[in-house]
């Protein structure tokens, strides 16, 4: 994996590899230990609270993705879809480790062996270093008091998110490929061109990157 360097930052989009493809982060493609987002912003300070609420005071995101996110939610609001909330953005590896360990522990409490608990946890929580949230380009978008999937807001995002460079990262019909169960709230910024192409082909990010690398 060849990542964006400081010398190339003016020509390669944020969150892309040197060949211009969106950065793929999963269990098989973990981020390098020294990976750092380029320009994180505190979303509570940065975002207009009349458009979206931020759950907690420390949620951050890569600025280019946050700008696109705000523009997208402003459009949704203009169409009568409100009550947006961001419940997760950038996560450090240490915090992701805690989330994963907590999930493993909960399964162990249900009687699973260590191996069984880790296997079950991986389907719901990415292992440290393997989470898209480390990039600052992924956000959990919710509506307070709902399970989000099936809401008008969720349906609108799935239909229109590509227009602002986002993809629904873990759709229900791609679980066998992504290795993650359906997450209707998890959206990843990949840029408009890539998002539009994935919408046209019906590919998830794993399929898209594999195809582009083989061309």
Regions found by a protein language model. Name each.
Residues 1-215:
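Extracytoplasmic cell-surface/polysaccharide-interacting catalytic and binding patches
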